[in-house]
């Protein structure tokens, strides 16, 4: 269980617009945390909760 996430892996949780957890992969939201991509990246909002602005992020590879 992620110490910064309110649920165990596979559990149920509410994913907010801002992300404080390191590995939130709860079944209720099916999203993980990642850095926000630049505005031109269409993949940024797919499958992740933004936890901060960054020019480099895993969901925009």
UniProtKB/Swiss-Prot annotation:
InterPro entries in UniProt: Metalthion_dom_sf, Metalthion_dom_sf_vert, Metalthion_vert, Metalthion_vert_metal_BS
Amino-acid positions noted as binding a divalent metal cation 2 in the UniProt annotation, renumbered to this chain: 7, 13, 15, 26
PTM annotation (N-acetylmethionine): residues: 1
Family annotation (PROSITE patterns): METALLOTHIONEIN_VRT
Residues that bind a divalent metal cation 3: 15, 19, 24, 29
GO term, biological process aspect, one: cellular response to cadmium ion
Keywords carried by this UniProt record: Acetylation, Metal-binding, Metal-thiolate cluster, Phosphoprotein
Positions of the UniProt region annotated as Alpha: 30-61
Residues at which a divalent metal cation 4 binds: 33-34, 44, 48
Molecular function per GO: metal ion binding; zinc ion binding
Binding site for a divalent metal cation 7: 50, 57, 59-60
Free-text note regarding domains: Class I metallothioneins contain 2 metal-binding domains: four divalent ions are chelated within cluster A of the alpha domain and are coordinated via cysteinyl thiolate bridges to 11 cysteine ligands. Cluster B, the corresponding region within the beta domain, can ligate three divalent ions to 9 cysteines.
Function text: Metallothioneins have a high content of cysteine residues that bind various heavy metals; these proteins are transcriptionally regulated by both heavy metals and glucocorticoids.
Family: Belongs to the metallothionein superfamily. Type 1 family.
Subunit structure: Monomer.
Protein name per the record: Metallothionein-1F
Organism phylogeny: Eukaryota, Metazoa, Chordata, Craniata, Vertebrata
């Amino acid at each position: 269980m992620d110490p910064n996430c309110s649920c165990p892996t596979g559990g149920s949780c509410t994913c907010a617009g801002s992300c404080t957890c390191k590995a939130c992969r709860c079944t209720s939201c099916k999203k993980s945390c990642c850095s926000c991509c630049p505005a031109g990246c269409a993949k940024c909002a797919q499958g992740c909760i933004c936890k901060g602005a960054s020019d480099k992020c895993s969901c925009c590879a």
